[in-house]
Design a protein with these regions (language model features):
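N-terminal periplasmic "start-of-domain" segments of outer-membrane beta-barrel proteins
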Residues: 21-35, 83-110, 137-141, 169-176, ...
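Short acidic/polar hinge/loop motifs at secondary-structure boundaries
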Residues: 37-39, 163-198
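Flexible loop and strand-edge segments within Gram-negative outer membrane beta-barrel domains
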Residues: 240, 267-289, 293-300, 304-374, ...
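Extracytoplasmic beta-strand/coil segments of soluble accessory domains associated
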Residues: 118-166, 193, 203-223
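Surface-exposed loop/turn segments flanking beta-strands in extracellular/periplasmic regions
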Residues: 249-257, 338-360, 404-421, 461-489, ...
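Conserved small-residue
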Residues: 237, 241-255, 642-648, 662-740, ...
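Extracytoplasmic gating/loop element in the C-terminal half of outer-membrane beta-barrel translocons
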Residues: 767-858, 863
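Short, acidic, small-residue-rich periplasmic hinge/interaction motif at the N-terminus
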Residues: 5-23, 49-53, 63-108, 223-224
Length: 915
């Protein structure tokens, strides 16, 4: 017997927990000093592997005269493990579908960002994501691939360390546009990596909610390699920043009120983490984060504290991991849009601002959310005799949010000057319990089979109660003192059980075939539908510098909570008992919407410095839920859901990453670019149009297409003068006017390194082919007097002679600016310099100045939303009035600008150092 040590080739540190496998499976795991024992006389080939390192195969006999084995860290990008399915993680070369992996392990040291969208938008092919408006804490709108669905639920599933994250937006005391995003609770600096699964071909294993894709977030863990297990790794990161109005308003006669309304929003952030390895293969990670961020809208401010503790234990065949995160937040979300008494509307509509509410009354109001969140998991695994690996994960995400709205006594809002107060209490929780068994079988020379069976139980609960009170007798806002009170309660529970089986074939580490089947049962599907099945299949074949992949999968979207069951509402009591009337007529046969996706792609590596990836996909959605109107003569009101809708979609994703120039480790130029094309078309609606004009779902057109009467020309009086009251003549027919999704979008950028220490980077985003319903300008043009374009036209008309060609031309222009919907469905193409980044590595100087107490230091400066070039005349070409996505029964609306707050320009300076 002979002891051998496994070390990191770059640092010489021992690797704790490296796995040594032979023909019969796992034979050993390295101890706390990196050692394992081997029989030198055994003529077998051993495989030594560890996550993040290139595996190495070596004959046991050759170790007689060798005391160490060096593993190469990150030598082959394809060996980085990414999420292959809900039950497995594999190297990129084994995947038959395109899963994007974003490594953020160095983000804490190199730069600063507050949002998940800043990280992923433009870096992941087939995905577009942005905040619904420019205030702090706003929801994110996701556009995933072709968007071939009629549903308003368009968010992907999000998992954080295996815990199903509750990403429900909260708008209990304000409008949906000003909702509080659940993603605000993510501590960005804690994230180690993100895997993005974009469609059913890869997401089928996640079941009946994964048609929008899945985002897998893995947070940082304790270090596993530490010389002599004495030293902890300590990181401290400090950020100061400011936000300002990025694009000043110039579309109105009086722009000063709007431009002067927005403020400079100051922000500061502190992040620190400690990582430590202990004996007996144990590690610990702790982090603390403080964010204090003010937005450009007065009163918009987010103060958030978070702490995380992670513990890992590895001992031969047994591993244990536990994570606990706590987040406390206090955020003020002043309401600026979508209402008569909101700020931006009152400054936009008239040349004399604040016509409907005094500015002092708006500023006196407050909308505040306090939230507490706990996210935790416990993960266990054990390798049984026979190399059967059992794994179990229990995850919990519990969130309590209290909202308080106040209108102080004495301020006039509408006809109320006696004050108002609303209080909401919301408790959201997600629980998931996963149990998995897997075993690897050696079938023949170079042929292995891994079989996996996984059971997943998920429970999601949402309970909300609120009370709204108004008209207090004095300056005391105790709820009991109000003369008018309204109480609201709601509850929601979703229970899902999924069973997933998977078979994975590996031939010669070149050909990989994966087949899976998921069975789901849920309380949201009809009582006559026992369960739903979702199959998947993928193939990957690797040549030396090229990979071909093909994948097919199916997934779904669950029905609305009331779709499956008939409900009644109590309407009083009679001598014979309660009086009830119908509320919703459910469908006991209702099923989840089903999306099928086939994906083909190829990846190339060119001269080891360039990678190119091409993906083609087609999506086919069936069983989309259409709500058919009920007859009141039958005793019902409203509508009943049926699975009759169909949508087709397809797209292309092209990605490039490369190093154009490198001189040792001193100079380099890395570039990246991606281009996405996507389209969809409704093919069946059950023979009817589903309308929320100007958005419609109509056969032959994109989902949520803009479809409405066009403007034929100006309206004239009998004397030939322009009729300013009528404005224009609308066509009797409807016409297609655009779609809410871009046909082409993507990003490009570079990272330049000079003299080893200096870095310069950029990210540019672009989109072509999308339209926005500019409801802001639509309303101002007909209800106010402040739209500059129309005012200039009216002034020019007054100086022209009736009946002349000049007069008629101006009248034609006025017809195109009149308050008609078709006039304000506008193109929203853009090119945006999203990020400009400068950094300098001060590590050498820091070690010298502190005598190696500080071993790393970096300073960076970043500007986000530097400028945008666009043909959209509104505040910003990336806005969403409904707050992103939401659970909604029936058709909603997409791509509407209803006095959305514009996105700010943000400046941040960051100093980070490690001890």
């Amino acid at each position: 017997m002979h002891k051998v040590r496994v070390i990191n080739q770059d640092t010489g540190e021992p690797i704790i927990g490296a796995i040594i496998k032979g023909p019969k499976g796992v034979q050993a795991v390295t101890d706390e000093e990196g050692y394992f024992t081997v029989n030198n006389n055994d003529d077998q080939v051993l495989s030594i592997s560890y996550v993040g390192f290139k595996p190495q195969n070596i004959k046991a006999q050759s170790l007689q005269n060798q005391s160490t084995i060096s593993l190469i860290p990150g030598a082959d990008l394809q060996e980085v493990l990414v999420t292959a399915s809900i039950s497995s993680a594999r190297s990129q070369k084994a995947l038959g579908s395109k899963v994007d992996h974003i490594d953020l392990s160095n983000l804490s040291k190199e730069s600063h960002t507050n949002s998940l969208s800043d990280i992923l938008d433009g870096k992941v092919g087939g995905v577009q994501m942005y905040q619904s408006n420019g205030k702090v804490g706003m929801p994110i709108r996701f556009n995933m691939r072709s968007g071939a669905t009629m549903s308003m639920e368009r968010d992907p599933i999000i998992y954080v360390d295996g815990v199903k994250f509750n990403n429900t937006h909260v708008s209990d005391i304000n409008s949906s546009q000003d909702a509080l995003s659940a993603l605000n609770d993510l501590t960005i600096d804690d994230i180690a990596s993100i895997d993005v699964i974009k469609g059913p071909s890869a997401a089928a294993s996640y079941g009946a909610e994964a048609a929008n894709g899945v985002i897998i977030i893995t947070t940082k863990r304790g270090k596993t390699n530490n010389p002599e297990n004495k030293k902890a790794d300590i990181l401290v990161k400090m950020t100061l920043g400011a936000s300002t109005l990025a694009r000043k308003y110039d579309q109105f006669v009086n722009n000063d009120a709007l431009n002067n309304f927005f403020q400079t929003g100051w922000q500061k952030s502190l992040y620190t983490s400690v990582s430590k390895a202990f004996q007996a293969n144990q590690s610990l990670f702790f982090s603390y984060n403080l964010n204090d961020i003010a937005g450009i809208v007065p009163g918009n401010k987010d103060q958030r504290h978070s702490a995380k503790l992670a513990y890992d234990l590895r001992s031969n065949r047994f591993t244990l991991g536990a994570t606990a995160s706590y987040i406390h937040g206090n955020i003020s979300l002043p309401q600026t849009a979508m209402g008569r008494y909101d700020a931006i509307w009152n400054m936009m509509i008239n040349q004399t601002p604040w016509p409907y509410i005094e500015e002092s009354a708006w500023r006196a109001q407050s909308w505040i959310y306090n939230n507490d969140r706990f996210i935790g998991n416990l993960r266990l695994s054990y390798i049984l005799p026979g190399d059967v690996k059992l794994e179990s994960l229990f995850g919990v995400d519990v969130n309590h949010t209290e909202g308080i709205y106040r209108l102080p006594y004495g301020y006039l809002l509408g006809n109320n000057s006696e004050g108002a107060k609303s209080i909401s209490n919301r408790r959201n929780s997600n629980l998931n319990w996963d149990i998995k068994a897997s075993r690897k079988f050696h079938l023949a020379d170079k042929l292995d089979l891994t079989a996996t069976l996984l059971s997943q139980i998920v429970q999601q609960k949402e309970d909300m109660n609120s009370i709204a009170a108004s008209h207090f007798r004095s300056d005391v806002d105790n709820i009991a003192a109000a003369t008018e009170r309204t109480v609201t309660e709601s509850t929601f529970e979703q229970r899902t059980w999924g069973l997933y089986g998977e078979a994975f074939l590996n031939y010669d580490n070149r050909l990989f075939i994966n087949a899976g089947l998921r069975r789901d049962a849920s309380n949201l599907i009809g009582s006559n539908v026992a369960s739903i099945y979702y199959p998947s299949m993928s193939v990957s074949y690797n040549l030396r510098n090229q990979k071909f992949r093909l994948a097919y999968g199916e997934s779904g979207r669950l029905p609305y909570p009331t779709d499956a069951r008939t409900s009644y509402v109590m309407d009083g009591v009679s001598a014979y008992g309660p009086i009830v009337h119908p509320q919703y007529k459910g469908n006991p046969n209702i099923k989840p919407e089903r999306m099928r996706e086939i994906e083909f792609g190829s990846d190339w590596t060119i001269k080891n410095n360039h990678t190119l990836s091409l993906t083609l996909y087609a999506q086919y959605t069936t069983d989309a839920i259409i709500y058919e109107d009920l007859l009141s003569s039958d005793g019902w009101i409203g509508s009943m859901p049926n699975n009759v809708g169909k949508v087709r979609g397809c797209g292309l994703e092209l990605n490039y990453n490369g190093t154009l120039w490198r001189q040792g480790d001193r100079h380099s130029l890395d570039v990246y670019a991606n281009l996405n094309y996507q389209t969809n078309k409704v093919t069946n609606t059950g023979g009817r149009d589903i309308t929320n004009y100007p958005n419609v779902i109509k056969e032959g057109y994109p989902v949520y297409a803009f479809y409405y009467h066009t403007v034929d020309g100006p309206s004239f009086n009998r004397d030939g003068s322009y009729n300013t009251k009528v404005g224009a003549i609308e066509s009797s027919d409807y016409a297609y006017l655009g779609k809410p999704f871009p046909a082409v979008n993507g990003a490009f950028g570079f990272n330049l390194k000079l003299f080893k220490n200096f870095t310069l980077g950029t990210k540019w985003n672009y989109a072509l082919g999308a339209s926005i319903y500019n409801q802001s300008f639509y309303n101002v043009s007909g209800l106010g007097d402040n739209l500059k374009k129309r005012n200039d036209q009216l002034q020019a008309l007054a100086n022209a002679t009736v009946g002349t060609p000049e007069y008629n031309q101006i009248a034609d222009e006025l017809a195109k600016s009149a308050r008609f919907r078709a006039n304000y469905i506008e193109k929203a193409d853009f090119l945006r310099l999203s990020t400009l980044y400068l950094g300098y590595d001060l590590s050498t100087l820091a070690r010298k100045w502190t005598q190696n107490v500080v071993n790393g230091m970096r300073f960076s400066f970043a500007i986000q939303n530097v400028f945008v070039i666009t043909n959209y005349p509104g505040a910003d070409p990336q806005v969403e009035s409904n707050g992103g996505t939401r659970r909604q029964r029936g058709i909603g609306s997409l791509s509407r600008d209803i006095t959305n707050a514009p996105h700010p320009r943000t400046y941040t300076a960051t100093l980070s150092f490690t001890l």
